[in-house]
């Protein structure tokens, strides 16, 4: 096991100074200097070239440590000297862009044609685990809910266009995906003048009829508050009219959501653990001052609809864990990564039998000891990050207070 110094990203949507959990963990873990006036958004843990981690004992990049022995023969054969995943902590003060991430064919195409904006050729499915209450928009709502919003929110219906809405309703039963794609394409090509014309109407309705905004079944006060909040951060933005098309979820600590490639989403607020395939590719369409690639996104989204609950990832007990603590497995339907959450109370021990691949372990709460099977001993406290070699059994012990650790890993 090797202790790491990791990379902190400062983006405008991050929490400021010591309000940022990402910054506080980096400060506690390796002495990162926190500026009280700077927004700190992400803590990156991995070997991605846009924000690599370094081994504290040697000062060398983590990638130089990756060999068939440390990551396992199968993982090394497929991924070489780069980890297949990127592990993060996000501290969200302001809504992130409405975005999607490419699948593998699109990732290769975008990197080839526009390497300035798309810096690698990989896909980027990702999973978020809430550390605090976490609000997000994720995936297209069921068509029934979209229809209700179009019926009950006049400024939304009029913004998209009455004729476009009629065509949507007339074709949705024959081909739901195509009907949604056509309607969404119409919405995304409205000009700035129209956005500025209808935004005040949408926000005013959210304020004046808060409890009934969008209908009580799927809308109501929480949804009207969301519209008002988003407009305060990004006034007159196309994202405001996209929001009713997407599921709005509030996750509690320990709950998780998996986001497939080419599914639209936006993180609204909170602190999360995030893991993804090792990519930094983002296709944006709203709530951002950065480059928007609307044509690419509109032409490549899945347009699959589902309710919010179907996108949640339910953790299960981890079969390779034993002891008096508790270890849960978050296992998305891809090979690049899974996440473990381990909780150990004072006086308890929890063993994680050797994982057949590389892992990165982050301590978020408490203090204790890590023990390897060959006499390796290391202390743990919040912000400590360790790279764990393949097939390396671990025992996690808590000393004076409960310990919580998250561990991203890849097994093939």
Curated annotation (Swiss-Prot):
Record-linked PROSITE patterns: PMI_I_1
Gene3D superfamilies according to UniProt: Jelly Rolls, Phosphomannose Isomerase, domain 2
Keyword Zinc: yes
Catalytic reaction(s) noted: D-mannose 6-phosphate = D-fructose 6-phosphate
Keyword Metal-binding: yes
Primary localization class, coarse: cytoplasm
Active site: 284
Reported cofactor(s): Zn(2+)
Cofactor stoichiometry and binding remark: Binds 1 zinc ion per subunit.
Gene Ontology biological-process annotations: carbohydrate metabolic process; GDP-mannose biosynthetic process; protein glycosylation
GO MF, one annotated term: zinc ion binding
Entry keyword set: Cytoplasm, Isomerase, Metal-binding, Nucleus, Zinc
Residues at which Zn(2+) binds: 99, 101, 126, 265
UniProt-annotated location(s): Cytoplasm; Nucleus
Organism field: Schizosaccharomyces pombe (strain 972 / ATCC 24843) (Fission yeast)
Function, as annotated: Involved in the synthesis of the GDP-mannose and dolichol-phosphate-mannose required for a number of critical mannosyl transfer reactions.
Gene Ontology annotations for the cellular component aspect, listed alphabetically: cytosol; nucleus
Name assigned to this protein: Mannose-6-phosphate isomerase
Alphabetical list of PANTHER family matching this protein: MANNOSE-6-PHOSPHATE ISOMERASE
EC numbers on record: 5.3.1.8
NCBIfam families: manA
Chain's gene name: pmi40
Known pathway: Nucleotide-sugar biosynthesis; GDP-alpha-D-mannose biosynthesis; alpha-D-mannose 1-phosphate from D-fructose 6-phosphate: step 1/2
Family per record: Belongs to the mannose-6-phosphate isomerase type 1 family.
């Amino acid at each position: 096991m090797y202790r790491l110094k990791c990379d902190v990203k400062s983006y405008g949507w991050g929490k400021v100074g010591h309000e940022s959990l990402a910054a506080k963990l980096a400060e506690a873990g390796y002495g990162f200097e926190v500026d009280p006036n700077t927004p700190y958004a992400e803590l990156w843990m991995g070997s991605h070239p846009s924000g690599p981690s370094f081994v504290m004992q040697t000062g060398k990049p983590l990638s130089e440590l990756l060999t068939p022995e440390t990551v396992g023969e199968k993982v090394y054969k497929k991924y070489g000297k780069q980890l297949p995943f990127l592990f993060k902590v996000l501290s969200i003060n302001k809504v992130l862009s409405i975005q999607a991430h490419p699948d593998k064919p699109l990732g290769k195409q975008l990197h080839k044609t526009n390497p300035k904006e798309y810096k690698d050729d990989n896909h980027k499915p990702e999973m978020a685990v809430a550390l605090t209450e976490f609000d997000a928009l994720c995936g297209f709502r069921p068509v029934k809910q979209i229809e209700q919003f179009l019926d009950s929110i006049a400024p939304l219906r009029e913004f998209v266009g009455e004729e476009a809405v009629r065509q949507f309703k007339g074709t949705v039963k024959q081909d739901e995906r195509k009907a949604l794609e056509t309607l969404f394409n119409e919405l995304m090509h409205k000009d700035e003048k129209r956005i500025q014309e209808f935004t005040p109407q949408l926000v005013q309705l959210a304020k004046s009829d808060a409890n009934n905004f969008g209908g009580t079944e799927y809308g109501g006060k929480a949804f009207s508050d969301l519209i008002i909040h988003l407009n305060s951060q990004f006034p007159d933005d196309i994202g405001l009219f996209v929001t009713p098309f997407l599921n709005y979820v509030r996750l509690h600590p320990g709950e998780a959501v998996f986001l497939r490639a080419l599914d639209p989403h936006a993180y609204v607020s909170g602190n999360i653990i995030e893991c993804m395939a090792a990519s930094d590719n983002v296709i944006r369409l709203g709530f951002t001052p950065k480059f928007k690639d609307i044509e690419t996104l509109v032409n490549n989204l899945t347009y699959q609809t589902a309710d919010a609950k179907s996108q949640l990832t339910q953790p299960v007990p981890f079969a390779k864990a034993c002891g008096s603590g508790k270890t849960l497995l978050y296992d998305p339907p891809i090979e690049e990564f899974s996440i473990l959450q381990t909780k150990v109370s004072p006086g308890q021990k929890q063993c994680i039998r050797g994982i057949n691949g590389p892992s990165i372990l982050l301590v978020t709460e408490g203090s204790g000891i890590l023990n390897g099977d060959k006499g390796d001993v290391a202390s743990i406290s919040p912000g400590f990050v360790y790279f764990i070699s393949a097939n390396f059994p671990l025992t996690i012990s808590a000393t004076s207070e409960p310990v919580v650790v998250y561990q991203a890993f890849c097994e093939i």
